Design a protein with these regions (language model features):
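Alpha-helical segment of the N-proximal tetratricopeptide repeat
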Residues: 15-38, 107
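Amphipathic alpha-helical repeat scaffolds of TPR domains
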Residues: 13-18, 46-62, 84-107, 137-149
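TPR-adjacent "capping" and linker segments in tetratricopeptide-repeat scaffold/adaptor proteins
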Residues: 3-18, 80-83, 112
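Short coil/linker segments at helix-helix boundaries
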Residues: 62-85, 92-125, 152-164
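Canonical positions in the second alpha-helix
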Residues: 8, 42, 79-80, 128
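Terminal, low-structured helical/coil segments at or just beyond the last alpha-helical repeat
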Residues: 6, 127-165
């Protein structure tokens, strides 16, 4: 097949809910690329679909846990900005920062950067907690998870240059 000689097929708008269930399932199977592809298909027929946007953002950030994935931080930030709810923008920015920081934990030389990333995520979760809909504990759960990781990994802020000499 010659690149560009074929066109993508459009999904039917009335199948969006079922299709998004498949995207969620692929995320749970640790197949973010397939979830991303499905979300792109949804955007082709419903460009502003907020459920697809959330799944897309989460699938993009899922790539941080894949060793050879090409994570696109600018794309993630761009998609977060498309969320209509300020609460969701702040909350998913926290998730983005948290997942990026957790990926840094895999490299012992990056632990202080992981600390900073988790602290940035915690700050977002604190803001999101104040804005959260009634009976929504999601920002609290994420905040506590970040704090526990900092404690468990004994993460510290970077030493200042003067402290090194």
């Amino acid at each position: 097949l010659i690149k560009g000689s074929m066109e993508y097929h459009l999904i039917h708008k009335d199948t969006i809910d079922t299709v998004l269930d498949k995207a969620r399932q692929y995320r749970s199977l640790r197949e973010p690329d397939l979830a991303i592809s499905i979300c792109i298909d949804v955007f082709a027929v419903d460009a502003d679909n907020q459920d697809a946007l959330v799944i897309y953002i989460l699938a993009l950030t899922d790539q941080y846990s894949h060793q050879h994935a090409k994570v696109q931080p600018k794309k993630i930030a761009e998609m977060i900005a498309k969320l209509k709810s300020e609460f969701h923008q702040i909350y998913y920015t926290g998730i983005f920062l948290e997942r990026k920081a957790r990926a840094l934990l895999k490299n012992p030389m990056s632990q202080s950067f992981a600390y900073e990333g988790l602290m940035e995520a915690i700050a977002k979760y604190e803001i999101a907690e104040k804005m959260a809909p009634k009976h929504c504990s999601d920002p609290i759960l994420r905040y506590n998870s970040c704090l526990r990781t900092i404690e468990k990994e004994n993460l510290q802020p970077r030493a200042e240059f003067d402290e090194l000499y």
